[in-house]
Amino acid sequence: MEKINFKIFDMWDISEIQIVDPGLRGVINLEPKLILKSHGRNVVKHGQTKVNVVERLMNKIALTGHRNKKHRIELGRSTGKYSRNMKIVLDAFQIIEKKTGKNPVEVLVRAIEKISPRDETTIIEYGGARYPQAVDVSPIRRVNLALKNLVHGASDKAFGKKKKLSQSLAEEIILAYEENGESSALRKKKESEAQADSAR
């Protein structure tokens, strides 16, 4: 039986995309699907590795108002409505393809590889005192932080402005792909790794 190779949104082929970072090969899922909606089938430990990376990006858009554990910002453009979040990502991908001339899914994967932090700090308590301790970031958390920082950077740039969230998301992904210093996700990565270096 011939294997059907679905394209993302029936527009972009992802069969040829290779993950360069060896630490992320097992956690960035590029399984070809026509409809990127898993309906919560993978809500188990490490189940995120079975969810396509584009769907994970769409899921992050529903939480752009959260900063740490609190919902601080009300942004009506990004809600829990799946069809709306899918439209934002689709529009962003079309902008990326128009500006770069490349497959937007590949641009997203390269951006994730470049902005996913390798080190961060945690707090350890010793003798009643609390000390920051540098720790390595697990591969799944690296991807989660990269996607979260991309979406937060995009929503912050669109908040209170006429710019659409899809436009700012496309810009943020392109800046991260180019390793441009204006990318807020790249700045957060460098900040996290600098804090970890100082806590060693």
State each model region's role:
Residues M1-M86, L90-R200:
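Strongly charged
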